[in-house]
Regions:
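Jelly-roll (double-stranded beta-helix
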Residues: 1-268
Length: 268
């Protein structure tokens, strides 16, 4: 699987068994210009688990913008989307990969007649996200002013389309979709047309070409079959994916833990 984590409010801290630490957040998700800000302009993480990795993703409750403090001393409002994207079967056992995205070069915005569309994956009206996709899909965050209209030319092969309403309401054909509701659409290659309600709208648009393959899940593991799941749990127990650490570990303790694990694994 790949998880796509889009931070809408607050911030997140990632650490993993390959020794990577990443911090990303929401300050400029809808910004008009590239701006480093406290999170370096990054608001979205793509984490491809592939053959397996141990990781933690914690809310960034640290005082930022130059203030002194430690995690937990300042509680921020937090809100995010996390989307699980299946990998094609031929690519399920790739090496783990983590990528942060943000800004016009990586997640461009399209502004048109009262609407703002942030392209997280795929393309919208000639602007494409930079992430290298393993399958044919589109992820858009759409913000609309009251009574504005939004259109999207969807690929005919995208048999699956989903809209999740964060706030406000929209009209699709004769159907009203309200906040916190999900609309499932079919694609025939025509243009998707949406009109915002009197309070405007903020929604997530997802579409993709169906992979038509099995998915098995248990606990924190996702694989293709039950046999693959058993192999994944065995790999985890043996330490092939990394060894867990306490979320209370400081960065120094975590790095020492990861370095010790790597050193152990390198022995014949």
């Amino acid at each position: 699987m790949t998880t796509v984590t889009i931070c809408l409010r607050g911030g997140l801290v990632h650490r993993d068994s390959d020794g990577r630490k990443q911090v990303f957040g929401a300050e400029i998700l809808s910004a008009k210009k590239n701006d480093d800000g406290p999170y370096g302009g990054k608001h979205t993480q793509w984490l491809t688990f592939g053959k397996g990795i141990v990781h933690e993703l914690m809310f960034d409750n640290m005082r930022r913008r130059g203030q002194l403090g430690h995690r937990g001393t300042s509680i921020l409002h937090q809100e995010l989307y996390q989307i699980w994207v299946d990998l094609p079967s031929a690519k399920r056992m790739v090496n783990p990969r983590v990528e942060l995205l943000g800004g016009e070069d990586e997640t461009p915005t399209v502004e048109h007649q009262g609407t703002t569309t942030t392209v997280i994956a795929g393309e919208h009206y000639g602007k494409a996200a930079s992430v290298d996709l393993t399958s044919d899909l589109t992820i858009l965050r759409v913000e609309m002013r009251a009574h504005s209209s939004w259109k999207h030319n969807e690929a005919k092969q995208h048999g699956t389309m989903i809209i999740y309403m964060r706030t406000g309401s929209i009209l699709i054909g004769s159907q009203i979709v309200s906040a916190h509701c999900t609309a499932h659409l079919t694609s025939d290659g025509d243009e998707v047309k949406i009109i915002a309600g009197q309070e405007g709208a903020d929604f997530l648009f997802l579409s993709g070409k169906p992979l038509g393959q099995n998915v098995a899940a248990r606990g924190s593991m996702v694989a293709g079959t039950n046999a693959d799941l058993e192999k994944a749990f065995a790999d985890y127990e043996s330490g092939d994916m990394g060894t867990p650490w306490s979320e209370r570990y400081s960065d120094n303790d975590w790095r020492t833990h990861v370095a010790k694990y790597r050193k152990t694994k390198m022995k014949p």
